[in-house]
């Protein structure tokens, strides 16, 4: 079955109860940002050591899940690029770090800049 990104996000959110995170929004976003960074790193590692398509697809699926959960939690939506704009595994990991940088701001008592956060999400999707 083929899903749109919106369908995937809603399906992932409906199943997220098994990954329920307590606390306030900042704590949930911090968890999701750490997960996104971790999975992007695992994807980059799988690519670099040649773990094969199955491992890479599994890690990329995990990246997609965390990105969907961040979108669900914030109400922001990533803008998906065309295939020829794909930054590669290291570019994706770098952009996941940009999302984490945005998410940690509220934990430091600073505002979460919606425009900057949107650009970071778009970067991970790219």
Question: What positions do the PLM features span?
Answer:
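Flexible "arm" and connector segments at domain edges
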Residues: 1-126
């Amino acid at each position: 079955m083929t899903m749109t990104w919106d369908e995937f996000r809603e399906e992932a959110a409906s199943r997220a109860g098994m990954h329920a995170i307590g606390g306030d929004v900042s704590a949930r976003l911090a968890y999701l940002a750490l997960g996104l960074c971790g999975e992007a790193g695992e994807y980059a590692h799988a690519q670099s050591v040649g773990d094969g398509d199955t491992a890479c697809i599994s890690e990329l699926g995990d990246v997609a899940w965390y990105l969907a959960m961040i979108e669900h939690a914030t109400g922001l939506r990533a803008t998906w690029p065309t295939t020829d704009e794909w930054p590669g595994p290291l570019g994706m990991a770098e952009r996941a770090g940009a999302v984490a940088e945005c998410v940690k701001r509220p934990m430091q008592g600073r505002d979460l800049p919606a425009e900057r956060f949107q650009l970071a999400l778009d970067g991970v999707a790219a």
